[in-house]
Each structure stands twice: as C-alpha cells, then as structure tokens.
Amino acid sequence: MNKSTLALAVTVGVLAQQAGAAGFLEDSKASISSRTMYYDADMREGASTPANRQRETAEGLKFDYLSGFTQGTVGFGIDAQALVGIHLDGGKGHHPTGNSNSFFPSDGNEAADEWSRLDGNVKARFSKTEAHLGGALAPNLPILIANDSRLLPQTFEGGTITSKEIDNVTFNFGQLEHASGRASSNSTGLSVAGASQDSNKFLYGGADWKVTKDLLLQYYYANLEDFYKQNFLGLVHVYPIAANQSFKTDIRYFDSSSDGKNGDPGFQFNNNNGFAKNPGEVDNKTWSAMFTYTLGGNAFLIGHQRVNDDGGFVFLNQGNLVDSNGNPEGAGGASFYSFTDATVGSFIRAGENTTFGQYSYDFASLGVPGLKASIAYLNGQDIKATNGVGKDLSEHETDARIDYVIQTGALKGFGTTLRHGTYRGNTSTLDQDQTRLIFNYTYSFM
C-alpha cells in the first residue's frame, strides 16, 4: 500500500465520524467509467517485430468517488479512485515490451492479463481556496498535463492548492513527488526523456487572469529539481465578430534551462533524440501562435511553432526510468501543452519550425448534436541534425478523427471516437500509421 492510499484510509476513518455533516454526503459524486480501446501502431520501416507492429485491444474501468466538504470554516473531504485494466486481445507478436510500450503492461514477453491501481486524495476548503493531497492528482496546466490518451489516466502524487480569492484570477501552486503511468500499477519518481534517474520534487506556481470575458493572461513557473526550470507566458483572446462567428488568438511562450545535476550521468535530457548545444542539458525557448476562425459549426485553425536552435523542448516524462534491477519501469506516456502534441509525432526538436492547420466541424449545426469531425496537418522543417552540422531534417503528419456521443435514451453519454494518424519524416521517429478506436461510457451513481 503506497503512502497516499494509507493516508486516504486513515482519513476515511476520521471523516466517517463527520459524514452526516451537511455537504459531505449531499455534495458527493460517484461514477464508473468504461473505456474500450483498439490500438494499432504500424511502423512502416524495419522488420516485422512486436515493436514495429503493435495491435492490441483492452478494457479500462475507472471508479471515482468525490465527496463534498464538511461544514465549518474549514471543510474537509476525500476523493478515491480505482483503476482496472483488462487485456482482451493482441497476443504474441503484437505486444512490444519494455519502455517501447505504454498501452498495457507486460508480463514477460506478453501483455499482462490485467492490472489495477487504487489511489485517493484528502482535501480541504477555506473560503475560495482548495488544497488537495494524495496520489490521484491530475493537473491540467501549461507546465504539466496529466496524460489520458490511452486506456487509463496518468496520475500524480503530491499536493496542490487552487485559490480564487481575487475576482477573475485563479492561482495554482503545487509540489509533486511521484507519477503513476497510464499503463502501470506502481509509481515512480519524476524525470525527463532520456534520463534513468528521477527526482521527487517538482514545484510549480502561477496564475490565470481573466482580464475581460474575452481575454486571458497566464504566467507559470515550474522546477523539476536536478533537471530543469521553466517559465511560461500565455495569452488567449476571443473576438466575437457576430452571432456564431468569432476569431480566437492563442499565443504561448516557454523558456527552459538546466537545474542542479542535469547533464550528469543518469540526469541527461536526450533533447527528444535531437541536437543540443550542450548535450544532455536543458536549454530551450519555444513559442507558438494559433489563430482560429469559427463560423457556425465550422472552425478553421492555422498556426506556427518555433523551437530554438540550442535544444529540444522539455516536459515531465518518465518513459526511460529503470528499476533497481535495471529493468524498464514501463512508466511511459506523457503530454505537453502544444498543438503539436499530435497522434504520433511531437515536433519539438532543436531548430524545428512547424506550420500546422486544422479544419473541424460540429454537426450540431446540421441537427446532429454529438457528432464532430476534424482533420489536421503538421509540417516540421529546419530540424537540426543530431551532430549539428548535417543536413536539416523534416517531418510531417496528417491526423483525422471523428467523435459521436449519444444524446438521449438509455445509452445517453455513450461515446465513440475513431482516430487515425499518418507520420512520415527522416528523423529518429519511425514512419508510422496509427489507428485508435475508442468506446467511452460513464455512469453516475450520485
């Protein structure tokens, strides 16, 4: 039993005495979510091996309980989460092992039959400020996004504070110590791509300021001890042109630098398998600008992202961690705050200039609510060769998806998603065709 689960059990016993307090039970929510996913990753280069042709189907079940808060100046509550993954298909020959697989954990050279995880948080509320402490945290911030792009979600252990004491301003602070991968029953420390060592101290703080109803300004600072420091600035503005017509501007800037032991053996950042002015170290500035014109159900997006020449973009990534025996932890799977975090590629190597566009349509405008479709194209150029002197590299990707959620009847809320991505390039990322078919359903008890 990990520390957060033990703390949750103790807290449940304490709060059980107050469970009758107005708000604790009355405001509670409980739900069970089912996600069935077919995942097919077909590498278009190299021999036909499990690592080059992954094809698996699995079922994920997630139970969530969110209590309300007890009465009093300071209210207390608990959150609990249970995750179960069940492997359905994709036997020998279709399941890669080690850190190359982040869809389902391995048992020897095959997929495990099932895996599970239990975690939870304790929480407190004072006025318009909430604190959460535990192992079921799922931040969604510019400097950290919990990944939920496969069967079950990635979660973090630590503490967070969110405060809205000032009108139109939301402050977020936190310290995180461990992460549980999206295909893992255990937790690890925190790290970056390429590093075999980890850190138990990720500090962050920042604010979202709603200047007007149409303008949002953001600033965040993050520090992963012994790896990197990062500053983020963001601006989001929506200009309402007319009814059902608007123009959105989204500008983002990241400035990241080395911290502590970064660059030492075990603490080296692989710069996303690209060039680095100082190999193994973090040294990066990345900006992006996106513009979206919406007219009725149509949305046209165009944007550009620039990664500077000194090194790749950095973010929390536990994919290369190993256990005490030198075996892969299987903690891969990470997200970052960029449109270029695409189905297959990331487009964040040193020197890379990426131009991207997307067209999406909401069929509610045609009387079919719940049906949406989109197609996107990303083209990355000027990627610096790993040795810094060779010919610049390039990559491109086309992504398409269609989503439908049933709006009425016994199956209201049942959702289906079909995604397909085609990636080609001359970088270290293998050419790949990837398909995901996903069925989602959530049933609320309370």
Predicted regions: what they are:
Residues 93-113, 119, 130-209, 218, ...:
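Surface-exposed coil loops of outer-membrane beta-barrel proteins
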